[in-house]
């Protein structure tokens, strides 16, 4: 039995992960934590999320005493916190010997030079960063098992990389073009005008400047053009990706490339059949559908995930179970 502390449990991702871990027979929740100045401290989780009324846990402030209690009692800590907050908390808990599963972007790049540009801070813990593993569960299981510092991927990168990584050896130098739409929960729980009921509408954002673009490119080993879109639905991501494959590539070659997922129970791949967001919402699954034109050399692949599940909480749970061999 492994004991897990969840910090940032009042947000959509933290609450979703709480529900997932609560349902696991081999995991227990050491505690749920929010910042000391949070308006949610002291509240039962079910007051914020009535659908979790079966979880009788209260949100505690992350005081120094609380951190000491986590170190004494927990086997691992999950950080569903802001990037700049995770930066320091991850390093501290790692130094105390706990396994850390960070859902922010604070440890996703191995190159410290990336952080000022994409996250607005200098990375102060290069020695911890050097130990961090990118937690793309279907691809990095061996590394996830071997380290105590796991950077859980972003939601768009999870959808995009699951679709693209099998094709890496078949790609030309032409940049893959990724157009992805996410539900409004991807913007977080804080009230914002553009995600309010009366204002939300399908629109691109972060054009040619979203921080998930270099994350995808780094893990793929090739530059990409990535355009995220805000959708007027709650949950889910659909990424439609166009790539050019090397001359002579056949449909059979593509099918063989995607056979890497034949033993991956959470990834479903279909030829000439494309996924819908509703097929994956509230599941840990990724559905891929692809079609290849041998004459032009262009392939279109669509990837559907739940942004709060496979794009965050359920992938964190995958990483936890891989790390502890559960």
Curated annotation (Swiss-Prot):
What pathway does this protein act in? Amino-acid biosynthesis; L-arginine biosynthesis; N(2)-acetyl-L-ornithine from L-glutamate: step 3/4
Q: Where is this protein found?
A: Cytoplasm
Q: Name the domain of life this protein comes from.
A: Bacteria
Active site (record annotation): 155
Tell me which InterPro entries the record gives.
AGPR_AS, AGPR_type-1, NAD(P)-bd_dom_sf, NAGSA_dehydrogenase, Semialdehyde_DH_NAD-bd
Per the UniProt entry, the Enzyme Commission number(s) are: 1.2.1.38
What keywords are annotated for this sequence in UniProt?
Amino-acid biosynthesis, Arginine biosynthesis, Cytoplasm, NADP, Oxidoreductase
Which transformation does this protein catalyse, written as a reaction?
N-acetyl-L-glutamate 5-semialdehyde + phosphate + NADP(+) = N-acetyl-L-glutamyl 5-phosphate + NADPH + H(+)
What processes in GO biological process is this protein linked to? Answer: L-arginine biosynthetic process
Q: Which GO terms describe its molecular function?
A: N-acetyl-gamma-glutamyl-phosphate reductase activity; NAD binding; NADP+ binding
Chief location bin = cytoplasm
- For the protein in the UniProt heading, the enzyme class is oxidoreductase
Q: Name one GO cellular component term.
A: cytoplasm
Pfam families on file: Semialdhyde_dh, Semialdhyde_dhC_1
Q: Which PANTHER family does the annotation name?
A: N-ACETYL-GAMMA-GLUTAMYL-PHOSPHATE REDUCTASE, CHLOROPLASTIC-RELATED, N-ACETYL-GAMMA-GLUTAMYL-PHOSPHATE REDUCTASE, CHLOROPLASTIC-RELATED-RELATED
Concerning its family, UniProt says: Belongs to the NAGSA dehydrogenase family. Type 1 subfamily.
Described function: Catalyzes the NADPH-dependent reduction of N-acetyl-5-glutamyl phosphate to yield N-acetyl-L-glutamate 5-semialdehyde.
According to UniProt, the name of this protein is N-acetyl-gamma-glutamyl-phosphate reductase
Say which species the protein is native to: Shewanella baltica (strain OS185)
Native organism taxonomy:
Bacteria, Pseudomonadati, Pseudomonadota, Gammaproteobacteria, Alteromonadales
